[in-house]
């Protein structure tokens, strides 16, 4: 596949959505993408029509029907399988770029470390759902739990975001471990928005600028 899959990861309130919007404007004009390539913006859960229905079930379940941890994990896996098969892989095969707000790393961090489900099981589901697809570059927007809670209190929260401090601390630990093990690019998310955007741009130029030069 000639396209590129880029992912933004991090705990609640780290600014992923803000930076995704910035890159949506910057990347197509950056000169890094091949001629004719389009940028597809997406998210997990909810990157497809089926994914939107699953997102609602996971984050805003009806009444007292909150899914059990294992059921929650399987719903995320179903969302990812549909997402990869319907949107991500076809776009990459056509040479387009895909920028996703969360991917499989979030499941390991939230359901593995946060919910304390079996990591081996989650990794097996990851392989099945993605059919072995691995992001070309993942950015970890690193934010302290304390700052995450401050930012979270300033907005409405879904079921996952409303979890307590202990849960969020485990999730943050998970992201730190994954970033190290999977060679993610860490960025300090407690800076001004413009500083984070500039750091993202610099890293993208570093990783993909030489590639574009070699293709000319």
UniProtKB/Swiss-Prot annotation:
Specify which residues bind ATP according to the UniProt entry for this protein.
10-17
Query: What's the catalysed reaction?
Result: dTMP + ATP = dTDP + ADP
Q: Name one GO biological process term.
A: dTDP biosynthetic process
Q: Which Gene3D superfamilies match?
A: P-loop containing nucleotide triphosphate hydrolases
The EC number of this protein is: 2.7.4.9
Identify the enzyme class: transferase
Keyword ATP-binding assigned to the entry: answer is yes
Q: Which GO terms describe its molecular function?
A: ATP binding; dTMP kinase activity
What are the protein's UniProt keywords? Answer: ATP-binding, Kinase, Nucleotide biosynthesis, Nucleotide-binding, Transferase
On whether Transferase is a keyword of this UniProt record, the answer is yes
Note the superkingdom of the native organism: Bacteria
GO annotation, cellular component aspect: cytosol
* Similarity comment text for this entry: Belongs to the thymidylate kinase family.
Role noted for this protein: Phosphorylation of dTMP to form dTDP in both de novo and salvage pathways of dTTP synthesis.
Per its UniProt record, what HAMAP family does this chain match? Thymidylate_kinase
Supply the name of the protein.
Thymidylate kinase
Q: Which organism encodes this protein?
A: Prochlorococcus marinus (strain MIT 9303)
